[in-house]
Amino acid sequence: MATFELYRRSTIGMCLTETLDEMVSSGTLSPELAIQVLVQFDKSMTEALENQVKSKVSIKGHLHTYRFCDNVWTFILTEASFKNEETTEQVGKVKIVACDSKLLSQ
């Protein structure tokens, strides 16, 4: 199964990468094993979001920038509002990256 490496830029992905780098630097972990952990992280995040997340959210905001390159859409919104059934959250600036899920099956 192919995966995207997008989730490595999330907070949890960056913390994992930083921890793995520290472990490789100290000799606790081999670089090859660290790469395997990151590949498994990519697969697990894709699977979890695909199978376990059931809630829906609507997003409104001012479109600052958009880009389409290599079947990947990137949107940067300012003054964004995220709304689900229970709550609304205001965010000053948000970057949304959307990939075609059909690319995963290639």
Curated annotation (Swiss-Prot):
Coiled coil regions, renumbered to chain: none
Subcellular locations according to the entry: Nucleus
Entry's Gene Ontology molecular function annotations: RNA polymerase II general transcription initiation factor activity; TBP-class protein binding; translation initiation factor activity
InterPro entries for the chain: TFIIA_a-hlx, TFIIA_b-brl, TFIIA_gsu, TFIIA_gsu_C, TFIIA_gsu_N
One Gene Ontology cellular component annotation held by this UniProt entry: transcription factor TFIIA complex
Note in the entry: The displayed sequence corresponds to the form of the protein present in strains susceptible to X.oryzae.
Role according to the record: TFIIA is a component of the transcription machinery of RNA polymerase II and plays an important role in transcriptional activation. TFIIA in a complex with TBP mediates transcriptional activity. Protein involved in the resistance to X.oryzae.
Name listed for the protein in its UniProt record: Transcription initiation factor IIA subunit 2
UniProt organism field: Oryza sativa subsp. japonica
Gene, per the UniProt record: TFIIAy
